[in-house]
Amino acid sequence: MHKLMTARTNPLPTIRRTLSCYLQGFTMSRKMFLGLIVILASGCSPVSVNDYSAFEPRLVLQDFFSGPLTAHGVVKNRNGLVIRTFNADIQASWTDGIGTLDEYFLFDDGERQRRVWTLIPNGDGSYRAEAGDVVGAGRLQSAGNSLFLEYVLRIPYGESTVDVTVDDRMYLVSQAVLINESSMKKFGFRVGSIDLVILRQAGKPATHQ
C-alpha cells in the first residue's frame, strides 16, 4: 500500500511533463520572437543619402573640395579598438567638372600612403569615383549636408592583397568641417572602421610639400 501510494504520488513525472511543456512553449515563444525580429528588420529600409536632403549647411562638392584640406582620424578593428591613427594632406581641384583629390597619408607607425581620386560626373548628380587601389569604380552621391561613397578597396595583406567593401558617409557640420565615418566589410561582415574629420585650409599650402 505504501509502495502504491508512493508510486501514485511521485511528483517527478508531473514535474518532467510540466518542464517539457514549459520548454516547448519557451522554444515556440523564442521562435516567434526571432521571427518578429526578422520581420521588423526586413521592414526597415536602409539609410539613404536622400534622407539628409533637407539638412544644412548644404554640401557643394566643388566648394568644399577645393584647394588644400587636411584629414585627421583613427582606424578601428571590428571590436571598435583603435589600432592606428593618421593625418593627411589633401589637394583638391576641378577641371571641366571632373574633380581630383590628391591625398597624402602619414600613419602613426611611420607608414605613408598616397591615393588620387578622380570624380567623374554621371549626369544624374552622382559621380564615378576612381583611384589606383579601388577595384572598378565607386559611386558617390550627395544630398543636403551629406555625401555617401561606396567602393571596393584593394589593400596589401602579407604577400598578397585583400578586397574589402568600404561605405563612406560624410556630413558637413560647418563650411570648413566635414565628419567622415567609414565602415569596412568582407563577405558582409564588419572587419573595421575609420573615423575622421576633414578640414578646409583655405589660403594655406599643403604641408606635405
Explain the meaning of each model-derived region.
Residues 45-47:
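Bacterial signal peptide processing site
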Residues 41-43:
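C-terminal motif of bacterial Sec signal peptides marking the signal peptidase cleavage site
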Residues 50, 88, 94, 168, ...:
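Sequence-level preference for short, compositionally simple segments enriched
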Residues 72, 76-157:
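Central antiparallel beta-sheet cores of small beta-barrel/beta-sandwich binding domains
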Residues 15, 19-33:
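Bacterial N-terminal signal peptides that target proteins for export
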Residues 167-209:
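Glycine-rich, aromatic-bearing surface loops/beta-hairpins
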